[in-house]
Amino acid sequence: MEIEKNYRINSLFAFYQPLLTAKQNNYMQLYYGDDYSLGEIAEEFNVSRQAVYDNLRRTEKILEDYEEKLHLYQEFTARNRQADEIQAYVATTYPHDSRLNRLVAGLENLEEQ
């Protein structure tokens, strides 16, 4: 469960990072991206562990609120699933159609940009 939560928060952070404040960005990057402990972040910014914890929880809620309103992550994962299905179908049904395979690969590459 914790791994799934961390993956989701990291994904939401990737989508909505530009909407966060510098402090929120720093704390999230250090905690989720660089695997710092609450104590290490607190020491780095000369604040209490509780302040870091509270900021992280508020920021997680903000990220979830953004996703609830904008659905960027949800739509991205849905498009990726659909693209994977199309790619698998084309690969098995039309394995020798190089143009079709290139077009499907191009769609996949657009999502990764």
Swiss-Prot record:
<dbReference type="InterPro" id="IPR036388">
    <property type="entry name" value="WH-like_DNA-bd_sf"/>
</dbReference>
<dbReference type="InterPro" id="IPR013324">
    <property type="entry name" value="RNA_pol_sigma_r3/r4-like"/>
</dbReference>
<dbReference type="InterPro" id="IPR007394">
    <property type="entry name" value="UPF0122"/>
</dbReference>
<dbReference type="Pfam" id="PF04297">
    <property type="entry name" value="UPF0122"/>
</dbReference>
<comment type="similarity">
    <text>Belongs to the UPF0122 family.</text>
</comment>
<protein>
    <recommendedName>
        <fullName>UPF0122 protein LVIS_0949</fullName>
    </recommendedName>
</protein>
<dbReference type="InterPro" id="IPR054831">
    <property type="entry name" value="UPF0122_fam_protein"/>
</dbReference>
<comment type="function">
    <text>Might take part in the signal recognition particle (SRP) pathway. This is inferred from the conservation of its genetic proximity to ftsY/ffh. May be a regulatory protein.</text>
</comment>
